[in-house]
Amino acid sequence: CCLEIGSAIGYSAMMLVSNINNFKVETIELNEERYLEAVKNIEENNLKSQIIIHHGDALSFDLEHLKIKKYDCLFIDAAKAQYQKFFEKYMPLVADEGICIVDNLDFHGMIFDIDNIKNRNTKQLVKKIKRFKDWIFDNELYDVEYHHVGDGICVIRKRVAQ
């Protein structure tokens, strides 16, 4: 099972359950319009039995509302400035042998050239993404693999005591 933070229109969740046998995804989406579109897409593709979708803010979401209590995977693709908060809240729900995937860590390549970003808000956002990247790579509790795929992805595993 996978917990996804940031459903958007449900595409990632639908791809996961369509390509992995007997897989379930539980997902949280803040934006009502995207949530409703995701519900529609999930229903039209007959995937309601495999995808549980919640509407709400993942940062204030009551964990008691989650139907699944332990996950094999956490997929974070929501508000980029909140990545560390999402990670800290939801990573404890991932099984010891599970993974966390964090998407869009290059932020259109801007992460590599922060000083040349003119827009103040964009610069602040990119700095927060960079702080998360630095924090997770320096965190001794996790093993982190970075992949230059798409807009940059990290695969994070809990470090196993030797």
Indicate where each model-derived feature is located.
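S-adenosylmethionine/decaboxylated-SAM
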Residues: 1-162
